[in-house]
Design a protein with these regions (language model features):
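Membrane-integrated ABC transporters
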Residues: 1-40, 46-88, 94, 98-106, ...
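Transmembrane helices of ABC transporter permease
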Residues: 23-34, 161-212, 285-296
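C-terminal portion of ABC ATPase nucleotide-binding domains
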Residues: 50, 60-61, 358, 459-509, ...
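Hydrophobic alpha-helical segments in the permease module
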Residues: 88-95, 192-197, 265-279, 285, ...
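Loop segments that connect adjacent transmembrane helices in multi-pass transporters
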Residues: 136-139, 212-260, 327, 332
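Cytosolic ends of transmembrane helices, especially the final helix of ABC transmembrane type-1 domains
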Residues: 236-239, 263, 310-338
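Primarily ABC-family ATPase nucleotide-binding module
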Residues: 339-387, 838
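Helix-to-loop junction immediately C-terminal to a conserved catalytic motif
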Residues: 407
């Protein structure tokens, strides 16, 4: 594909292309402001010469017309002074108003253009050729869009108006000085040529160092991204010290560059300030001489000095603008060069309706290369869009590349691939994206809920406008209008984007049923059910479900009341100390709903400390905390078996344990009272996370339990109004919105000291849920489970099954999979394959399978070897064929 020149490499061309009208308007306003500035410079001179100078009469003479003039303010210089001061005040307001208005216009224009640039960069990422993502780290792209273009936005508003405005102020002030005396004017500009030559030259060196700094910081961003993505491997292989050394070395290089930049910048500032201060010296010496000689009035000298002082600001602004312009051009070039790459997809036009794909997929001598390496070589094959075809081969056979090529994710560098009689390069991205689905082993999930990820494939365009009240509608129209001005998308993200027509349903209920069917096909229905038990829900939004869950709680309590089950779960009893709950839960008898009761900082909470002191528990908590920490530090120093025991520690993070050692040593040496307030808070926070049945080495006496129950009553009784929304108390008759569905049904703590208590309790709860027909409702609640960054809160198998479900949900004409179920066990893998093939009985499936034996379930098999099609045909025929490539793969399993 031909190279796409997505951006002009000249920043000024980019600015003019998208903002020339706004720039012209700001320029006009700037030009209009200059006469008022000039007039303001003349007023101080008039005050000195016509009011304060005793040689002048006590009135102001107006200009004469036809020899007749009018004398103003006769007889009183005070009123004359008031008049001139009022005029000066008016000019101050006018000039300040112009400056405010121009600055607001500049700021708005700069922000609009920055928004446009960031949007265009993000849009370009969406159109990057997929192989390019292997060469560019996400850290680099994120840094370029968020940080590197930030200064560019600030400069865009200043690009034309600042040189014009500040240059206009400078020239106006210089012109005014020349009008007082030409020699003073020459003195005012005598040093500018020196500054104009030296300072830009030094700034060029600063820019060169700036480019080096940007390159180094991109590498640092890439390394940080690697650290985040490989955190598990770094921890598993204990290579943290190596990573720290590598990071320190990189930051050392950045430090050296930045220090050189600072040295040059401050030298430039020193040089500029030094040369600038020479001009007043020339004014005082030469101008004073002229006043003494009577060749210049005192008012003119004072006005010239005031004007010269006004020269400093615009001159410095011009120099600063020049530096910013050079920096911005440099940053802009570096960013857009990284985005002007070959193979970028063209911008597509919106398509409302996409016709189904029909006919045949035909590859003829298709070759795929990447960075000079041939991945597929002269591949030819054909399949009907009603066939189910397996692709088998070794790991490096090219079967995964073949799948990507058929899905339109990589394009043939030579040869052809036709789908439904049309070359794949001619098919719009909308056709490929809506009529073909692709799933790989590493298919990612978006940050969001399970439902967000499943329904993501149905969000091609807004299909239903959002419902707004009149006030919200006006605000939204204004926001979308601003987006249009900034060249951003104007589709309303709050509109209904889920296209029910794709599924052949009409409403939310139909969508839920279609989703449940798809989850069942992908063998992940039980996974989502289990996730549903782990979510919290909003009582106001789902009152019917809450009522049904409260019935489940009552049924669960009835079953647990049986003597055989009574010890499985310790209920939330207001009058009992709960051995399987933390000390914080025992004291509060509630769950925290705000950061005010952060479990890691309860020792700092003034109200909690007041309750401890009131009930005489503070010293006991301190001793428990010191004892627990002492045991942990002893285990940590033990290594071996001690290290294994530390893996179960929940009261303190292991990487923070060394921070407590000086505190424990100090308390042992000098007593707990020797600890200061911050140190006591750290120790007191530890016991709150202690669960008695888990940390069995901590003895919990009956007297301590009694005092904890007193503290529970005191905590609830004295809770300040401002903190009442920060906790939600355990109430047997009320649904707790801070607890998961599972914990709301159990409404207690599973016994940690009883073998298989959790399994028995879960089985009992499953029976209750089935009896009350809550299973599907909990699965629907599971749609709201947050999957984490890239699905990090899910297992690899769960991520793969959800990816398969997501792809099949959009009802594609062709489903392409590349080893999409590698994390599944054999039984689950077989169920998913069979269910998908059954669902796609009359549609196309191309599946690059991990095991060759899986291919026996498909209509046909394509065998890949070394990037070529080794053979193809029916599985049974190829299996029987002597010396076939398929039989060799089967023997290798």
């Amino acid at each position: 594909m031909a190279a796409q020149q997505n951006f002009d490499t000249s920043l000024f061309k980019y600015i003019l292309r998208y903002s020339w009208k706004a720039q012209i308007f700001i320029v006009i306003v700037t030009l209009v402001s200059l006469p008022f500035y000039y007039a303001s410079l003349d007023v101080p001179k008039q005050i000195i010469n016509k009011v304060l100078d005793t040689k002048h009469r006590d009135y102001l003479q107006s200009p004469k017309f036809f020899g007749v003039g009018l004398d103003l303010f006769q007889g009183d210089k005070i009123w004359l002074l008031v008049f001139f001061c009022f005029i000066f005040f008016c000019f101050v307001l006018i000039n300040g108003g112009f400056k405010l208005y121009i600055n607001v216009l500049k700021g708005k224009l700069g922000e609009r253009m920055l928004r446009r640039l960031r949007y265009q960069l993000y849009d370009t990422i969406l159109r990057f050729p997929l192989p390019h993502f292997r060469k560019t780290s996400e850290g680099e792209l994120i840094n370029m869009i968020t940080a590197e273009v930030e200064p560019v936005g600030g400069f865009i508003g200043d690009a034309f108006v600042t040189p014009l405005y500040q240059g206009g102020l400078l020239l106006t002030a210089i012109f005014f000085i020349f009008m007082q005396d030409w020699s003073m004017g020459l003195a005012s500009v005598a040093l500018y040529p020196i500054q104009g030559y030296l300072i830009p030259k030094l700034q060029r060196k600063v820019r060169a160092l700036g480019r080096d700094r940007v390159r180094e910081m991109r590498k640092v961003s890439e390394r940080i991204g690697d650290t985040v993505n490989l955190a598990r491997e770094i921890r598993a292989h204990q290579t943290g010290d190596y990573e720290r050394a590598d990071y320190a070395d990189r930051m050392g290089r950045v430090f050296d560059i930045r220090f050189k930049i600072y040295n040059l910048k401050f030298f430039v500032k020193f040089l500029n300030n030094f040369l600038t201060q020479m001009t007043p010296l020339m004014f005082f010496s030469f101008g004073g001489y002229l006043v003494i000689q009577g060749q210049l009035s005192l008012g003119a000298l004072v006005a010239a000095l005031a004007a010269q002082k006004d020269l400093l600001s615009p001159w410095n602004e011009l120099l600063n603008n020049y530096q910013i312009q050079q920096d911005s051009q440099q940053k802009y070039e570096q960013v857009v060069t990284a985005f002007n790459i070959d193979g970028t997809l063209p911008m597509e036009k919106p398509i409302d309706r996409v016709e189904p794909l029909k006919g045949e997929i035909a590859a003829r001598d298709a070759t795929v290369t990447d960075e000079g390496v041939t991945l597929l070589e002269r591949v030819s094959f054909g399949m009907q869009l009603t066939e189910r075809v397996a692709v088998v081969g070794a790991g490096s056979s090219g079967k995964d590349v073949l799948a990507q090529m058929v899905a339109g994710l990589v394009r043939p560098s030579s040869g052809s691939l036709r789908i439904g009689g049309r070359d794949i390069n001619e098919l719009p991205p909308a056709v490929l994206g809506r009529r073909i689905a692709y799933v790989a082993a590493d298919s990612g999930l978006m940050t969001g809920t399970v439902g967000d990820n499943l329904h993501y494939v149905l969000k091609h365009r807004p299909v239903k406008p959002a419902d707004y009240d009149p006030g919200e509608a006006a605000l939204r129209r204004s926001a979308l209008a601003e987006a249009a001005i900034a060249g951003n998308a104007t589709d309303d993200i709050r509109a209904g984007w889920i296209d029910y027509d794709v599924l052949g349903v009409k409403d939310e209920a139909g969508l839920k049923q279609a989703t449940l069917t798809t989850l069942r096909m992908a063998d992940t229905l039980d996974d989502v059910y289990q996730l549903g038990l782990r979510v919290t829900i909003d009582v106001k939004r789902q009152p019917e479900l809450v009522a049904r869950l409260m019935k489940a709680r009552a049924a669960m309590r009835a079953r647990l009341a049986d003597a055989a089950n009574a010890t499985l779960v310790e209920p939330f009893d207001p009058a009992a100390f709960i051995m399987n709950a933390s000390l914080a839960e025992n004291m509060f008898f509630a769950t925290a709903a705000a950061v005010a009761f952060d479990p890691d900082k309860l020792g700092e909470n003034a109200y909690v400390l007041a309750v401890l002191q009131k009930t005489g528990l503070e010293d006991e908590f301190m001793q428990i905390g010191l004892g627990v920490l002492g045991n942990l530090l002893e285990l940590a120093g033990d290594g071996g078996a001690g290290g294994a025991l530390l893996a179960d520690v929940s009261v303190v993070k292991l990487d923070e344990l060394p921070d407590y050692k000086p505190l424990v040593d100090k308390a042992k040496r000098d007593g707990a009272k020797a600890l200061d307030g911050e140190e006591r808070a750290m120790i007191l926070s530890v016991p709150f996370k202690l669960v008695p049945t888990r940390e069995r080495h901590v003895e919990i006496s009956d007297a301590f339990k009694a005092r904890m129950l007193e503290a529970r009553k005191a905590f609830a009784a004295g809770l300040p109004d401002k903190l009442k929304g920060s906790v939600e108390f355990f109430d047997p008759e009320k649904f707790n919105t801070q607890l998961t569905l599972r914990d709301n049904i159990l409404f207690g703590k599973v016994a940690l000291n009883q073998a298989q208590a959790a399994q028995h309790a879960n089985a009992m709860m499953a029976d209750v849920i089935a009896e009350l027909e809550l299973h599907d409702a909990i699965i629907e609640a599971g749609f709201g489970f947050q999957v984490g960054t890239r699905g990090s809160r899910l297992s690899a198998a769960q991520r793969q099954k959800l990816a398969v479900a997501r792809a099949t949900l959009k009802r594609p004409d062709l489903l392409v999979l590349a080893e999409a179920t590698t994390a599944l066990d054999s039984a689950s893998d077989a169920r998913v394959v069979d269910a998908v093939l059954k669902e796609f009985k009359d549609r196309g499936v191309l599946w690059a399978v991990q095991k060759a034996s899986t291919a026996r379930r498909f209509d046909r098999v394509i065998v890949m070897a070394d990037g070529r099609v080794a053979e193809e045909g029916a599985f049974a025929e190829l299996e029987k064929k002597e010396g076939s490539a398929l039989s060799a793969l089967l023997k290798a399993e």
